[in-house]
């Protein structure tokens, strides 16, 4: 995503083939399907609202699970504003904090850090001005202590000094749900910086699609993220123009 975005391309942070399109149940999860179909019906993609339910990750991915549905729970919270203005806007940029940390620190593969340092895949300093940082945790369900370390690395890079706000994906299976909230507020240490939590993207189910590089408005009152520009265009119309 970061490499393609640096080249000026809009990329889409969302469903993948194995976990979503090839869902072991009888159909794709309805919420995920709605936003996936936004690639063919743009109206579906322009406004992101909370899912009414959430699903647990599967424990069994064998052939025995084909045709079985995921364990489903009622969503009780919706998008949660942890602090800051109820309405904020900016250009989406971000990713999985586990991966961003590895890319910047080289803790997993040393050459990742070399590549990031050389090409500046993760923007630095003022290049975050006007951006909304989106973050989520992976299926590894890192501890709150580990999340604090990773967030502090972003803080040390000065990212929180420039962004317009943060949106945070629902933790998979709601593991460390409340603990993560406390860590975000503790590390950011700026009550004026908006943090919207429990948004349906990332490694939790179901999930929407976030287009990197697109300007959006986040509205806690209306419980929505509104895309302010189209992430797709009609190729025929574009070429004729």
Predicted regions and their residues:
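Short Gly/Thr/Asp-enriched flexible loops that form oxyanion-binding sites at enzyme active sites
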Residues: 1-4, 179-181
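Structural motif
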Residues: 9-12, 90-91, 131-133, 164-167, ...
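Structured loop/turn residues at beta-strand edges in well-structured enzyme cores
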Residues: 7, 128, 158-161
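Oxyanion-binding "anion nests"
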Residues: 92-144
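C-terminal active-site/capping subdomain that shapes the small-molecule cofactor and substrate pocket
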Residues: 137, 141-240
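Peripheral docking tails and interdomain loops at the edges
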Residues: 3-44, 51, 190, 199-241
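Conserved anion/nucleotide-ligand pocket segment
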Residues: 9-98
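Alpha-helical scaffold segments in soluble metabolic enzymes
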Residues: 2, 35, 99-103
């Amino acid at each position: 995503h970061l490499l393609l975005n640096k080249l000026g391309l809009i990329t889409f942070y969302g469903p993948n083939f194995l976990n979503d399109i090839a869902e072991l149940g009888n159909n794709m999860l309805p919420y995920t399907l709605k936003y996936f179909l936004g690639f063919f019906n743009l109206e579906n993609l322009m406004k992101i609202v909370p899912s009414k339910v959430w699903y647990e990750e599967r424990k069994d991915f064998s052939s025995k699970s084909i045709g079985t549905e995921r364990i489903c729970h009622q969503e009780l919270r919706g998008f949660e504003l942890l602090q800051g203005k109820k309405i904020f806007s900016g250009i989406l940029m971000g990713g999985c904090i586990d991966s961003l940390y590895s890319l910047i620190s080289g803790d997993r593969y040393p050459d990742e850090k070399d590549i990031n340092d050389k090409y500046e895949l993760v923007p630095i300093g003022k290049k975050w001005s006007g951006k909304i940082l989106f973050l989520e945790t992976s299926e590894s369900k890192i501890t709150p202590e580990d999340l604090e370390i990773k967030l502090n690395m972003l803080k040390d890079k000065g990212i929180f000094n420039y962004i317009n706000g943060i949106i945070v994906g629902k933790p998979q299976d709601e593991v460390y749900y409340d603990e993560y909230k406390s860590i975000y507020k503790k590390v950011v240490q700026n009550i004026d910086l908006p943090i919207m939590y429990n948004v349906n993207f990332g490694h939790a189910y179901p999930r929407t699609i976030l287009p990197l590089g697109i300007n959006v408005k986040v509205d806690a009152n209306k419980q929505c993220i509104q895309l302010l520009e189209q992430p797709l265009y009609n190729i025929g119309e574009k070429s004729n123009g």
